[in-house]
């Protein structure tokens, strides 16, 4: 669990920075995904904005709750982790169905899909252990 804070900070601040960069068109052309300038792809990309910001809000809020010793930080963390998995899965599904493979975007979204699974497992395991006590 001690590494979860680092993963949350990297992911949540990363999402905020990504959306600020996207909003102000600061992402270099060479880093952009394929067809990033087509209206459909712009809409597809921005469809993730509410989800990604909700991930950041719930993740950062769970860290705050943990810092002030509120037990419900675990529930907020679990919500954030599940939403993060969904974000990565949705993006990878789209890239798969459109037969598009860009290593950088696949790595970012693979990270979003996979890293939360370890912490979801730990939170659920800890919850079961607490319930049995």
From Swiss-Prot:
A Pfam family the protein falls into: DUF5360
Protein's membrane topology: Multi-pass membrane protein
Source lineage: Bacteria, Bacillati, Bacillota, Bacilli, Bacillales
UniProt protein name: Uncharacterized protein YvaD
Regions crossing the membrane: 5-27, 42-64, 77-99, 103-125
GO cellular component terms listed in the entry, alphabetical order: plasma membrane
Organism in which the protein naturally occurs: Bacillus subtilis (strain 168)
Location in or out of the cell: Cell membrane
UniProt keyword terms in alphabetical order: Cell membrane, Membrane, Transmembrane, Transmembrane helix
């Amino acid at each position: 669990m001690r590494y979860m804070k680092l993963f949350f900070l990297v992911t949540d601040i990363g999402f905020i920075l990504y959306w600020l960069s996207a909003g102000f068109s600061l992402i270099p052309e060479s880093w952009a995904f394929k067809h990033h300038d087509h209206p459909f792809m712009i809409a597809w990309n921005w469809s993730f904005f509410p989800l990604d910001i909700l991930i950041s809000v719930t993740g950062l809020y769970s860290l705050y709750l943990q810092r002030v010793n509120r037990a419900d930080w675990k529930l907020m963390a679990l919500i954030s982790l599940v939403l993060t998995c969904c974000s990565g899965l949705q993006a990878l599904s789209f890239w798969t169905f459109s037969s598009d493979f860009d290593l950088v975007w696949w790595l970012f979204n693979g990270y979003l899909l996979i890293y939360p699974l370890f912490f979801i497992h730990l939170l659920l395991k800890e919850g079961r252990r607490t319930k049995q006590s």
